[in-house]
């Protein structure tokens, strides 16, 4: 955002110097202000805190809407183990910051290049560019979170590293533009969200 602000400032300076009409300058200035405000809104990264009295609770990692709740066989890390998949679709207007869903230790981090088809499609989970993170808590519960790029998203940022500790209330990463997050959690987990339900990152209890 700093470089965008600098670029817009330089552009307006050039227009101010080179254009005799102040009308054109003010139009350009208004467009620049609108552009910067849009990017400032889109890349917002709010600080949120949640208090939980159960270290096994899994918190929503993202703002969005639940589009998948189904049992699956997970092969990337869990070698075909049956797990419950919960997917959250993030629209272009959603906050695109991602939070840690479970306090514990990061056991696995991988980034995969791929396609950029619409993130709400089921096959996007495997075919699109994505990053996978596995977290294990103090009680041995393991979950996987997968950040998935969408049709517009072209960059996934993951802040955590393997063999480091992580805690809820901390940011896990960021996905730029419309995208999706998949959670793979133990089959025996009690699910507290329904299909179509809106989630708030680092606030909504998933399981």
Describe the predicted segments one by one.
Residues 1-207:
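Contiguous, well-folded functional domains in the mature portion of proteins
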